[in-house]
């Protein structure tokens, strides 16, 4: 159940107090992890390679850059991606909130303004006063 999952996560977070967590990569997973951990009092070191070298698909130094498509797929609850969004919403997913804030019209899917999406993520992570260090 959701209640049991939240309790399990709280117990795991308690084990990380007074420790530092290193996260490699400021893509979607790295940013969500960094944000979640810092909101729960864990110090995070977030390492991103773009300052040194970008891949051919990467165009900016922003975090959470969507390189292939601006679509985060269906919002229909009977689809796998739609159901996942409902679950992420219940778990208070940082990136889902940002995505909804940056949404552009696209029918029954969640599509975002890619630049706005990445700028908000980058600003939230870099300006987080809860112990996130970007390198």
Regions found by a protein language model. Name each.
Residues 90-135:
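Feature captures the FAD/FMN-dependent oxidoreductase FAD-binding
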Residues 45:
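Conserved beta-strand positions in the Rossmann-like core of class I SAM-dependent methyltransferases
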Residues 21-42:
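N-terminal Rossmann-like FAD-binding beta1-loop-alpha1 element of flavoenzymes
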Residues 1-10:
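N-terminal amphipathic/basic-hydrophobic helices that include classical n-h-c signal peptides
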């Amino acid at each position: 159940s959701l209640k049991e999952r939240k309790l399990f996560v709280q117990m795991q977070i308690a084990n990380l107090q007074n420790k530092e967590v290193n996260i490699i990569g400021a893509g979607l997973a790295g940013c969500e992890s960094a944000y979640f951990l810092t909101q729960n009092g864990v110090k995070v070191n977030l390492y991103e390679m773009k300052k040194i070298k970008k891949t051919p698909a990467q165009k900016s130094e922003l975090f959470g850059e969507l390189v292939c498509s601006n679509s985060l797929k269906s919002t229909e609850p009977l689809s796998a991606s739609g159901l996942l969004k409902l679950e992420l919403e219940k778990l208070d997913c940082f990136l889902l909130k940002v995505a909804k804030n940056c949404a552009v019209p696209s029918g029954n899917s969640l599509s975002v303004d890619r630049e706005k999406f990445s700028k908000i993520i980058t600003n939230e992570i870099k300006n987080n006063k809860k112990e996130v260090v970007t390198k």
